[in-house]
Amino acid sequence: MPKSIFSFFSGVGLLDLGFDTAGYDIVFVNEFKEEFLKAYRFARQNRIADPIYGYHRCSIDDFFTCSYNAFLQHSIHLERNSGNIIGFVGGPPCPDFSVAGKNRGRNGENGILAQSYVNLITQFLPDFFVFENVKGLVKTERHRIYFDELKQQLQTAGYYISDQVLNSLSFGVPQDRDRIILVGIHRDFYGRNQHAVPENNLQFPWLQHALFGNAEEIKAEDWETTDPFHENSNRYFPRQTPNRYRELCVETWFRRNNVDNHPNANDVFRVKQGLHKMQTIPEGDVSGKSFKRLHRWRYSPTAAYGNNEVHLHPYRVRRLSVAEAMAIQSIPAWFTLPTNMTLSNKFKVIGNGVPVLMATAIAQTLSELLDEIVAN
């Protein structure tokens, strides 16, 4: 059965891109920031069809008001009448739950949006949903209490749920990035197939489409640590690192995406201060709070480019370009951001997104589970 996605907090659509790659139809897109929404449309032009119910620049809370509410309800009704499976996907803004962010929790201006998203799900009752956020939502005790309350609300509304902290390394992304993913399937979706209804929580095979195993085992391998920095130097893939992990290396993705010739190759912040430091930090030294130099034959730290964190190119005297940051997020080479988008917003929207390979794997696993329920 066709699967229709209603996307919220879409950003530039990296989570959506994963679902699109896995065969879902993105039919509705909602993003509050105008520049992000314009970039979403720009990146997909001539390659992916526009959502049939349009792009909506508004707050998620607007969907509880008359006109927006009626339009969303009508759109869902049309999809149901077409026999399509309905899904909501979204990652509410996460600075209020991030250890590196404001950490204000449920009462922060972003933190309250997690509640709004859950309220939307429990009002419109899609067949399934995906909720994505930073691991701080479950690793910090007071945030975990809030998360448990949200899950209880979803269960009361009839959803069988499963959540897991996942690391993007497991899915072939050249980046050490943890995210909490929560998925749910509504009890009504099971219909007559009552023997498939979970006894308690949804049994979701989180690593079914993972390219590699446990991320901690990956990180425990014999990776390159640091090497003296030499501008434009050549270094071969190290013998001690298993060859299968070449896929997780920054340099592999730089070459795959041909980042030097990418339309966003010249989108780079020029450093006005700290040039000497950039010339002396060893390749692979990511121990600093601010300046971190990536190693070409290792994975990147989390692609978070705010809070004074500066990621340096492995063998050039500069920061990473937008094209390179996109490669580290496993974004395909054809994906580009518009020239008139501010550089700050380009890095922000990339860093906020879900790595595409990770999103694709989750979408594939969910699709197979939904198909299995329908088939039985």
Question: What is the role of each PLM region?
Answer:
Residues 90, 131, 305:
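Redox-cofactor binding/interface segments in oxidoreductases and associated redox assembly factors
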Residues 26, 128, 301-302:
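Beta-sheet entry/capping signal
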Residues 85, 177-179, 298-300:
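Extracellular structured ligand-interaction cores
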Residues 13, 34-35, 93-95, 135-136, ...:
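Short, solvent-exposed loop/turn segments at secondary-structure junctions
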Residues 240-376:
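C-terminal target-recognition/interaction regions appended to catalytic cores
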Residues 88, 182, 351:
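Short, conserved catalytic/metal-binding motifs centered on acidic residues
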